[in-house]
Every structure is written in C-alpha cells, then in structure tokens.
A protein has these predicted regions:
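Acidic catalytic loop of the alpha/beta-hydrolase fold
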Residues: 118-123, 151-152
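Alpha/beta-hydrolase active-site loop
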Residues: 1-20
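Hydrolase active-site cap/lid region
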Residues: 39-94
Length: 175
C-alpha cells in the first residue's frame, strides 16, 4: 500500500546516486505509485531528489479502505477495518492509520505536483485537495483532469499533462 515501498524507493535513490552523484531525481507515481511517492516525500531524502509528482493518490490506507467499504459494500469501518489493520500490523509491521500519505506530505519541504481526475470512482477526487492543503509551503501545484477516471489523467489531458509536469519540474531542476 506504499508504506513499506517507500523504503525500497529510498534504496533506489541511493543506488542512482552511487551511479551518478549529480543526478537530479524526480519521483512520479500513479495510483499506488502516487501513494508511494507521497510516503517517500515525507522521509529525509538527499538534495538530489528535486520534485515529487503524484497522480490520483490517496490520503491514507485507512481512509481509502474506509471509503471502499462504505461505497462498494455499504459497510462500516468497525469491525472489518479495525481487524484488518490489526492483522496488517501483525503480518506487515504497520497499521492502516500509520500508512498515511497525508502525514508524510505534511513533512515534505520539496516541490510537489498533485494530479487527479474528477471522475475517479476509486480514489475520491476530494483527496487531492486535502493532500494539497496539507503540503507546507508554496512550492506546490495541482492539475485537475476534468472527466478523468482513476489513473486516466494522462490519457484525458494528453500533451497538457506532460507539459504541466515538465514545466513544474523545470522550475526546480538545473536542466
């Protein structure tokens, strides 16, 4: 769900920098990759990590599972989510509330671009605003893909998607 994956990403960053200490790194993820990107963003990353781009990520594992239980099945959080979170803690070493992109974004000082489709029926579009508002500083931006479903912003926006991403990155990278 992104929480343990952030540690893998940190190792990949170290590997890249061992190959090229002057590399400029952008972390860009879609869906679960977006969650991993945001969860990594709250960690202490080297100065060569310049920008984070998240596309249709969620606020926390707890929030997305709670939303899915309600929307898809009409079920409350208790007892299912509490039991599943306790099981995850026992098996994976973390609970669902701990795996929070929202908390990690609050610790992120580096630039971040938030992207989301308005017709996403998996990750609520409103989560983008919550995440954006949690990110400190002014080095942040949003890109809304009108009518785009989950993970469809790239397809719906076409060149606008990539032009926005590259323009945002260009503000913070040497070249």
């Amino acid at each position: 769900m992104g929480w343990l994956d952030r540690k893998d990403v940190l190792q990949w960053i170290d590997w890249v920098l061992a190959q090229d200490s002057e590399a400029e790194i952008v972390l860009h993820g879609v869906s679960m990759g977006a969650a991993t990107t945001m969860m990594t963003a709250g960690e202490d990353t080297p100065e060569q990590v310049k920008v984070f781009v998240e596309d249709c990520g969620y606020t926390s594992v707890w929030d997305i599972f709670s939303s899915e239980l309600k929307l898809r099945f009409g079920l409350p959080e208790f007892p299912i989510l509490y039991t599943a979170s306790a099981t995850a803690r026992a098996k994976a070493g973390y609970g669902f509330k701990e795996a929070s992109a929202l908390q990690q974004v609050q610790n992120c000082e580096k630039p971040m671009l938030f992207i989301h489709g308005t017709a996403d029926d998996f990750i609520p579009y409103e989560m983008m605003g919550t995440l954006y508002n949690a990110k400190p500083g002014t080095n942040k931006a949003t890109l809304t893909a009108e009518g785009a479903g989950h993970g469809e912003a790239m397809d719906v926006l076409g060149d606008t998607y990539w032009n926005t991403v590259f323009d945002f990155e260009g503000q913070y990278m040497a070249g």
